[in-house]
Regions:
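Transmembrane beta-barrel wall of Gram-negative outer-membrane proteins
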Residues: 183-218, 229-276, 298-314, 473
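Extracytoplasmic beta-strand/coil segments of soluble accessory domains associated
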Residues: 49, 56, 72-122
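A beta-strand signature from Gram-negative outer-membrane beta-barrel systems
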Residues: 135-172, 739
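N-terminal periplasmic accessory domains that precede
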Residues: 71-74, 100-101, 112-115, 128-129, ...
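C-terminal beta-signal and adjacent terminal beta-strands/loops
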Residues: 655-658, 682-740
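Gram-negative outer-membrane beta-barrel transporters
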Residues: 549-552, 570-658
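Short acidic/polar hinge/loop motifs at secondary-structure boundaries
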Residues: 118-145, 193
Length: 740
């Protein structure tokens, strides 16, 4: 709740981000981690080597003792490849309006291929198929750590290639029934059916699923005035009722020995109505004055996607490939708020209606050919069209205005840039050269030229052109088949978020109804300097990696001042100039074979992050918005094959103290306790799998401290300080799955 206050000094740090980062890396914690890693490496060299190729192959027999059900279960048993089998199996909405438009040739991290191919989809991709592929269909899994012109993706740290058996005819039907139980005694059912197999030259996969995503968030907030006296207390119950329904199919047809085609389709529906009950107690002047509000926000969301590709190989090994993807995401919600009085009567005070449609169309073609011994080149082009249509209606209670039926019976408020269409057409011709210098060294060089046109129409009309040259060099050196060094230099252009162009709702601040848009945005870009070292321990004991990289940003995007001439203080996303970021990642995934516990897999990671940017409001040097100091993650998985059981616990803990959001009239800082998940899984009754999951086992509070200022933050007039904490409680789920 806003009140007026007095002046208070804003803390300012002038310490160089680079010095802070180097200081963090040299802490005793990292000294200990490097010592442990060094001892591990020293001992492992005395053990026998496993081969002369950096690619690691895991045949189906490797996984037999763990009785996996899906391809994801198999991948989870490989050190360094863990992903929760109990994670959301429903569809996800990858919002093209927020960046990530187009497809490209791949990305960093671990990429998934199925039978050497990338699925031509974004929401329905190879990663989402892993929980749908029956383990009995998998012949072997390759972990590919090198680069090659034969691969379907480029630039990945490593690739997991799931290779399926080639049989004339086989089918399987996988089922899963689930029930989630929440801390407020609410329960929600879910489940999925997957029918897949091979018929002649056709591989097929059909899936239908329903995934509960119910959330009950309890929020408590205390605030104080500049003189440290009590201001108010707020308690909220925020409930979102959502179940995501997904229908999808993936088809792979081998037309001949030289040609093949793939097709996939997906439809997702995830209506997400929300209700809020809010109690506010005014504590000023030693008072105790309660008031009540309630909100009702019916929401709808659906997404569809189709994609396909065709590949033809010539007799000389050259390869031609063309693919297409089309998708659309529709979202709509209407937020209404009422004052609730002691006698049970209500009075509406807010109407906020938003609607958006995002469409994306992608076509990409390429030709790959060998040019010299050990060298290949791929050249081609990609065209991507993205369209956002959005509208926003705001109505408030007013004694003088004219009620409007379109605004919920309240007085209409003019919101600039509220009805807008944004369209981008982007072209990317590219050439990728891959050179296997010798059995231990490879280098991949890519040259991409991006040019695009962004047009905005509606409340404002604007059209601009952009062009960027994006080179990349990826060098890999296998010192041994186990130890690999990677050096990467690339220029990365971040695609603009279309939602930053237009006015939108503010779901993070009850005192602010809408966020302003900025129609003059430019894409920001950075140079990425990346060094990675990875060591795979002998005898499949595990993998340890260290990664350090630096980003040098140009035209970096943060909040900027867009206040109106009438004196209304406003901010929006905008370009602010140059900035830098440093990141250090240390990861490990190790079997406890040295303690005679080979079926216990321990995973851990430490991430340290620092950044430096000139704040556009205060002129001080600070970290990036919402980018903290890093995180520490730990977990283990224990398989007991003789009991056909496994269990595990994972912890995620961010390093608090610097996760801040600087805006034109407030400063927010987030912090929270470690977050724990656990699971128990066993197989019984003729290969039926039972899995119990507990999410947020300790009922963690995530907290935010917000300092609000009267007017512009540079005026340094403190209004209030808010201390908010929220929790969603422990969720327990049971999943029963099997195969027919």
């Amino acid at each position: 709740m806003r009140t007026h206050g007095s002046s208070m000094r804003i803390p300012c740090s002038r310490v160089s981000g680079r010095k802070r980062f180097y200081a963090l890396v040299s802490t005793p914690l990292f000294s200990l981690l490097f010592f442990v890693a060094a001892i591990t490496l020293q001992n492992s060299y005395a053990q026998p080597n496993v081969g002369d190729d950096s690619t690691v192959v895991y045949p189906a027999s490797y996984f037999a003792e763990w009785a996996p059900v899906t391809a994801q279960d198999m991948l989870n048993r490989i050190p360094g490849m863990q992903r929760s089998s109990g994670s959301n199996r429903g569809g996800s909405f990858r919002n093209a309006s927020r960046g990530g438009r187009g497809l490209g040739s791949g990305s960093s991290g671990t990429q998934i291929l199925i039978n050497d191919k990338r699925t031509p989809g974004k929401n329905n991709n190879s990663q989402t198929q892993l929980t749908r592929i029956d383990a009995e269909q998998v012949e072997y899994i390759e972990i590919i750590r090198s680069t090659s012109g034969d691969l379907d993706v480029r630039g990945s740290t490593q690739i997991a290639n799931i290779v399926l058996y080639e049989v004339l005819s086989t089918t399987t039907l996988n089922y899963e029934a689930s029930a989630d139980y929440y801390q407020d005694s609410k329960s929600e059912p879910g489940g999925s059916l997957t029918y897949g197999g091979q018929a002649g030259n056709l591989n097929f996969l059909l899936n239908a699923s329903a995934t509960p995503q119910y959330i009950h968030r309890v929020v408590s907030e205390d605030s104080i005035l500049p003189d440290m006296s009590a201001n108010d207390y707020i308690h909220q119950d925020r409930i979102r009722e959502q179940t995501t329904y997904v229908l999808s199919t993936n088809l792979d047809y081998q037309i001949s020995e030289k040609s093949s085609a793939r097709f996939n389709a997906l439809f997702t529906e995830g209506d997400n109505p929300m209700t809020v009950d809010r109690l506010t107690v005014d504590l000023r002047n030693n008072g105790f004055l309660p008031s009540w509000e309630r909100e009702d926000t019916p929401g709808t969301m659906n997404n569809w996607e189709v994609g396909g590709d065709y590949e033809f190989r010539r007799d000389n090994g050259d390869r031609f490939k063309v693919l297409f993807i089309a998708n659309e995401t529709d979202t709509a919600n209407t937020r209404e708020r009422w004052d609730v009085f002691g006698d049970g009567t209500e009075e509406k005070n807010l109407f906020l209606d938003s609607f958006s449609v995002i469409e994306e169309r992608i076509v990409r073609g390429s030709y790959t050919m060998d040019v010299f011994d050990g060298q290949s080149i791929e050249f081609g082009a990609e065209r991507a069209q993205t369209i956002l249509d959005s509208s926003l209606l705001l109505g408030i209670a007013s004694l003088t205005g004219t009620p409007s039926a379109d605004h919920g019976g309240l007085t209409a408020v003019n919101v600039p840039n509220a009805n807008t269409r944004v369209e981008e057409v982007r072209y990317e011709p590219f050439a990728i050269h891959n050179w296997r210098i010798n059995p231990r060294m490879s280098v991949e060089t890519s040259m991409v030229y991006e040019f695009s046109e962004i047009e905005q129409s509606g409340d404002f009309n604007n059209s601009r052109d952009f062009s960027f040259f994006k080179p990349k060099i990826d060098y890999r050196f296998d010192i041994t088949p186990r130890l690999q060094l990677r050096f990467l230099i690339e220029k990365f252009v971040r695609q603009l978020s279309f939602t930053d162009f237009v006015a939108s709702t503010d779901s993070q601040d009850d005192d602010t109804n809408t966020l302003a848009g900025n129609r003059n945005l430019r894409p920001d870009f950075w140079w990425n300097y990346n060094f990675l070292a990875e060591y795979r321990l002998p005898n499949d004991t595990g993998v340890v990696s260290a990664n350090i990289y630096k980003h040098r940003h140009k035209d970096y995007l943060q909040r900027i001042d867009v206040s109106s001439a009438e004196g209304e203080v406003k901010s929006a996303t905008g370009n602010i100039g140059n900035s830098e970021m440093w990141v250090f990642d240390l990861k490990g995934s190790v079997r406890l074979s040295m303690f005679n516990l080979p079926n216990v897999l321990v995973t851990g990671s430490v991430n340290l992050t620092d950044s430096e940017v000139a704040d556009p409001f205060l002129g001080i040097t600070r970290r990036f918005n919402n980018l903290g100091r890093g995180s520490i993650n730990l977990g283990f998985r224990h398989d007991i094959p003789r009991w056909r059981m496994n269990y595990g616990v994972s912890m995620r803990n961010r390093i608090d103290g610097a996760t801040k959001l600087w805006d034109i009239d407030d400063i927010e800082e987030d912090h929270g306790d470690p977050y724990f998940n656990g699971f128990l899984e066993f197989i019984a009754f003729d290969d039926v799998t039972f899995r119990f999951d507990a999410r947020d086992m300790t009922n963690v509070d995530t907290c935010r401290d917000r300092s609000r200022y009267v007017g512009h933050i540079a005026d340094n007039v403190l209004e209030e300080i808010e201390y908010m904490c929220a929790s969603m409680g422990t969720t327990v789920s049971l999943r029963v799955s099997g195969t027919f």
